[in-house]
Structures are given as structure tokens and as C-alpha cells.
């Protein structure tokens, strides 16, 4: 099958969005599928073009006989204001749409959202070219941006809902990163429930497992708590800084690895509290990040205490588990059931510094549980969320859906 994938973020960019399809595309290629990726000129998360790229309209990369990456113009900026963020999204929507018009001879179109504007490309292209269109939903926009306070205007929110409705009406099927997203359709778009809805969570690839096995665990000299990834509005990392303050008298270090809009504020807060047990590290390449994860004693998976995040399943959780690290999850919802089933961590109350600190102290005082629950996590990931198995299931479901609608 020849797949046209449209996603704003793609490697060498980093983050959950880029990693999701970066991994799945490689697996599809190995399984004999042909993939064309349409994405932005890489600039995320720092807002500057990656080495080897520049401000240009389009760049085509023939990676292999079965993989072509087409990078379209993007407004590279630091997205530190609503105007810059909106401009970043809209510029790719228009450049991506114009670039997509030239592409042909593919069997199915997959568009990954958010940003929601990428879905507009899929809606228009699928209509013009009469191609089967699957929308990959990684997060619920505009609800999530409203919940985080990035959008406060009801008018803007309502416009976002109209855009969402337009895109949904244009799709032939859905790929859901979180199974719980189906409830969103039940509550708001019940007419869409007759379309195929295929679950594809962010699991762990064989490549990641191989890298995790490659490096022996060399633990830090002191007990180490690690958070890696986006330091943004959704994570509620202020509560982790408070937990570090509570635990100052213990020989416990906190490591924050990554970047994001809240990083500066978190550093400032740590400095004001005089925290000597908190360290911030920049974004790391995958291999270096795996080394840091394996060095840690425990890893954190926090989110803000918002009903919207009850459906969230952060991909970093499975990566921590694959590295044999127990996780402290500060989320209420679907994730807690996974942790209970896997017996691979503890559950703390979201945005509750005392609860997070108590969970950290549990592992500090029970080192044997670190080994036991770490092993449980590895076993769970291997048996339940291997990306190779997950994407094979999706492709079969997609092919069945296309066959049933062959007159499209």
C-alpha cells in the first residue's frame, strides 16, 4: 500500500508528535509498504531551522525506494505568542496544501492532528482527489488548548469547533492515539461513530528496545528522579519543583530533561527556593536520553489536574517502562489502569506536591521495589504495546475499510 502521511512534525524534529510517526513510518517501510511523508521544514522545538535546512519552499528527500519525505515551507519562530503560534500553524497549512496538490498515486491519506489546521489539508485533498482519508487524532483540539488557557475567547473556541466539525465530516475513518477519545465522539459527534475508529497508542518500537538493551544501567551515585520531554502548560511541573523542595533534606536529585514554554519559569522557581537538588538538561538525542533514563532511580509522568487529561496516555511512560524504570504517574484516568495492571509504578494525585513526594520516598525507602516494578514494566510493554504489532493491526483495519468502500 502507498500511504501519503501529512504531519506537521517529523524527525529530525523531536517530541511525541514527531516520534510517533517517525517510528511508525520506519516500521511500515520494513513491512513492504511505500510511504510519502509531507511535513514542515524541521524547526521544532527551538524555532530555528535544523542544520542542513533553510528557509525554502519545498525540499524533497528520497530516503529509500519506499520512503520519500517532502518538507514544505514553515515559519520558524519561537511561538512565544498567540500570533506567532497561529502563524506557524497557518503557514504550514497553506504551504502543505499547495505542495499536496502535486502528489499522486497513493492509496490512502493519513493526516495527523494537532494542530487542527493540518486536518484542513486532508479535508480538501481527499475531496479533490477522491482518496480515502484517515484522521490520526493525537489530542483533542480546540478543547485542550482551551483547557490550558492558550485560548480564552469563546468566539475563537467556537470557530475551532466549526473547523473541527468540517474536518470530521470530510474523514472516512479515524486513528485514535487514546481509546478514550471515542467518548468525545459519543458526546459531541455521534454521527461519526459509524466510521472506522482504530486505536493506535504510542507504544515502543523494537529499535527502542534494542537501544535500551545496548546500554547497561549505571545508576547515579545519589537517588535520582527524572522527568523528560516537553516542559509546557499541560505537565503541571510546578508541583514537581515543590516536591523537590519538600525533599531537600534527603540525598535525592531531580533532573528535568528537555525544553518548553515553562522551562524558564521552572528554573526561576527552583532558584528562588534555593534548590540545589534540581538540575535542568537540554534536549537529548534518543540514545543519550535512554542512558539518562536508565541511570535514574524513578521517572515521573505528570499532567495538570484537568478532566480533559483523564484520557491522556503520555508516550514517555512506555519508554520509561521499556528502560526498566518504575514510574510515578500524576494523572487520573486511563493511565492509572495501565499502571495497576502492569504493576510498574505508583499513582500520585495530579498537581499534588506532597503526594508526589510521598511516592518518591516510597521508592527511596524500598529499593527492591525499583527493580521489581522496573521488570514488570519491561514485561508489560513487550507483551502489550510493541509498535510493530500495533501498526500491523491498523494497516489491516485500514485495508478492510478501503475494500468495503472501493467505489470511493
Features from the language model and the residues they span:
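Nucleotide-activated donor-binding/catalytic signature segment of Leloir-type glycosyltransferases, i.e.
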Residues: 222, 251, 255-258, 264-291
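Short hydrophobic beta-strand element within catalytic cores of glycosyltransferases
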Residues: 298-301, 319-322, 326-330
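A short, well-ordered alpha-helix in the C-terminal region of glycosyltransferases
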Residues: 355, 362, 369-383, 396
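Membrane-proximal helix-turn-helix segments that form the acceptor-binding/catalytic region
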Residues: 94-101, 117-120, 124-128, 154-174
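N-terminal subdomain of nucleotide-sugar transferases
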Residues: 1-63, 202, 407-408
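Conserved acidic donor-binding segment of nucleotide-sugar-dependent glycosyltransferases
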Residues: 341-342, 346-353, 362-368
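Conserved donor-binding/catalytic core segment of Leloir-type glycosyltransferases
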Residues: 217-235, 240-244, 255
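Carbohydrate-associated surface elements
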Residues: 180, 200-203
